[in-house]
Amino acid sequence: MKFDVLTLFPELFNTVMGESIIGRAQKNRLVEVNAVNIRDYSKDKHKKVDDYPFGGGNGMVMMCQPVIDAYKAISEGMEQKPKVIYMSPQGKVLTQEMAKELSKQEHLILLCGHYEGIDERIIEEIIDEEISIGDYVLTGGELPAMVLIDCVSRLIPGVLSTEGSFSDESHFNGLLEYPQYTRPADYNGNKVPEVLLSGHHANIEKWRMQQSLDRTRDKRPDLFNKLPNKNLL
């Protein structure tokens, strides 16, 4: 899967996305993250990419020309237009279900806003969907884009060692993940639950499911209330 990221700070992606699981996925050619510097497409002699908002107001707004020209440079000659996502606080909040759907795409283009936002005509011309990672404000769209890339890439076959690596995680099946333990079995008198040491796999699975249900009910009642047949759980 290919991610083209339109950004003013490509070096952030070259550093962070080259490490850990995503870095390995790129080396194995399962994922490609290509950071495109919007400033390279500015026709201004000073490579300016922003200007004052019409009607007044604080801050600067990213201009149409550099952004749309950067997009055209990526998509030119393609038979099928890639899905273009604007990382925006006004978008739908990213969920695991959304990530599953996005992982079915072969190519995504992510636009990272900055300053006070982008010219509305960019959204009208090239954006298919706006996505947020939460109801709060960040300096730019780079961190949200990295979150989306990480979340989606984990669902691509081969990126993780086994499917179980993500199918047991929090949110994958609508539940929070059960507690995890490692050695030693007794740390300063705080012991690992006996069932995990028993070797009885059916009992372990039953314990884990109950723990997931309890955690979801206690920590995220909003998720628990969405579960089907929750009254029978």
Curated annotation (Swiss-Prot):
- Localization per record: Cytoplasm
Q: What is its EC number?
A: 2.1.1.228
Q: Name one GO cellular component term.
A: cytosol
Which InterPro entries does this entry report, sorted A to Z? Alpha/beta_knot_MTases, tRNA_m1G_MeTrfase_C_sf, tRNA_m1G_MeTrfase_TrmD, tRNA_m1G_MTases_N, tRNA_MeTrfase_TRMD/TRM10
In this entry, which stretches build a coiled coil? none
Record keywords: Cytoplasm, Methyltransferase, S-adenosyl-L-methionine, Transferase, tRNA processing
- The keyword Methyltransferase is annotated on this UniProt entry: yes
Its family remark reads: Belongs to the RNA methyltransferase TrmD family.
Role noted for this protein:
Specifically methylates guanosine-37 in various tRNAs.
Task: Spell out the protein name for this chain.
Answer: tRNA (guanine-N(1)-)-methyltransferase
**Native source organism of the sequence:** Ruminiclostridium cellulolyticum (strain ATCC 35319 / DSM 5812 / JCM 6584 / H10)
